[in-house]
Amino acid sequence: MAHMVETMAYAGEVPWHGLGVKVADDLTPQEMMKVAGLDWSVERHPITTLVDGEEITIEGKKALVRSSDNKVLDVVGDQWIPVQNADAFEFFDEYVKAGGMTMHTAGSLKDGQIVWGLAKIDEYFSLFGGKDQVDSYLLLSNPHNYGRGVDVRFTPIRVVCNNTLSMSLEGKASLGISLNHKSEFNAERVRLALDEASKKMETYHEMADFLSKKYYKQADLFEYFNQVFPVTTNRAGTM
């Protein structure tokens, strides 16, 4: 299992890969960004090549360069507008200051191509009579590479690596919003979308609670799976 973690910080339990800087759960978004090693920006630079000794600029393309080490993160189009890490983490300010969330994890994946921030929501719900606690988080994924949009969503998954980020982003699109890089990051538009998504998150909680209270006999489960994944005669003969 590849974690693809470049740098990160976390509050709470140590991630499965053991990487990152452990922090208190009362950091501001800006403090979390700095401890996680994300206090850098990205800039678009012209791409040139030498042809018969003459320097020629490649039209329509820009190199996306990280300010901290001049690393080229990707090649993007002229119209591609980056979202700076500082702007991404500033988005968490309103929620953290209101007291409903605390910064929980943040980091850089794939050598800086993807940056994420995760805030833990104070509210949680329990299943199976309180035996299983399900936490809720607000995730912001900020890719610095072509072909991926900025994604902000609610998720029950604690993001600590590329795998858990992928699992979160594969969740229901209705729990958040995805923005392309053709325009500036619109924080107000995202907040409005999250207001609607929070209602759907409540529905998710109710459905999970309902299913957790259902009990089935083993024979019923076999019958159910046999209907969903029927075993053919040929396959049955080889089992």
Question: Which positions does each model-derived feature cover?
Answer:
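Intrinsic disorder/low-complexity polar-acidic segments
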Residues: 90-239
